């Protein structure tokens, strides 16, 4: 990247992306986010849903929550069928205490795929935060029924 001058052009774009990923691996999320921004500008905004997911990961680690929410919303807009984006959007909403919004996102995911086990687990977490323990345990049970491997500890802790 040092060989290129700013403003960066498409020629520098792959190197910016590589540096952003290296910075994420080195726990330099804020700098990675800046590289993702530089990449976005270098390619004149011609990016796909995966770009928004990767930049959201950097924003989340950098505690730039609104940025993370915006990037996940854009990823969903570009690829509404990828339910992992909806789960990620729900996770960010949970992080910032927007439990009702997280539930709405997860319900939309379940409309697309009623057997999406992770959505039920995340719904249960949101419901716990909202003091809806009975609903949370029902959501955890559904996640377990659908094969979510990460729900057992939650059931053990909150539903016994």
What are these regions (language model features)?
Residues 1-4, 36, 72, 106, ...:
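Hydrophobic/aromatic packing residues within the alpha-helices of TPR/SEL1-like helical repeat arrays
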Residues 18, 54, 88, 122, ...:
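Canonical tetratricopeptide repeat
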Residues 11-12, 46-48, 82, 116, ...:
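Residue-level recognition of tetratricopeptide repeat
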Residues 4-8, 42-44, 78, 112, ...:
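Structural marker of alpha-solenoid helical repeat scaffolds
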Residues 15, 51, 85, 119, ...:
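TPR alpha-solenoid repeat register
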Residues 25, 61, 95-96, 129-130:
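Register position in tetratricopeptide repeats
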């Amino acid at each position: 990247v040092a060989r290129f001058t700013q403003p960066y052009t498409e020629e520098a774009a792959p190197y910016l992306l590589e540096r952003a990923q290296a910075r994420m691996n080195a726990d330099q999320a804020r700098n990675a986010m800046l590289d993702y921004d530089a990449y976005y500008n270098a390619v004149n905004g011609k990016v796909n849903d995966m770009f928004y997911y990767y930049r959201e990961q950097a924003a989340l680690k950098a505690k730039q929550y609104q940025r993370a929410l915006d990037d996940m919303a854009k990823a969903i807009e570009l690829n509404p069928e990828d339910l992992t984006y909806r789960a990620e959007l729900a996770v960010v909403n949970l992080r910032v205490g927007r439990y009702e919004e997280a539930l709405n996102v997860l319900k939309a995911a379940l409309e697309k795929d009623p057997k999406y086990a992770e959505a039920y687990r995340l719904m249960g977490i949101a419901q716990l935060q909202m003091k809806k323990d009975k609903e949370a345990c029902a959501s955890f049970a559904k996640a377990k029924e659908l094969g979510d491997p990460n729900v057992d500890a939650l059931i053990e802790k909150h539903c016994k």
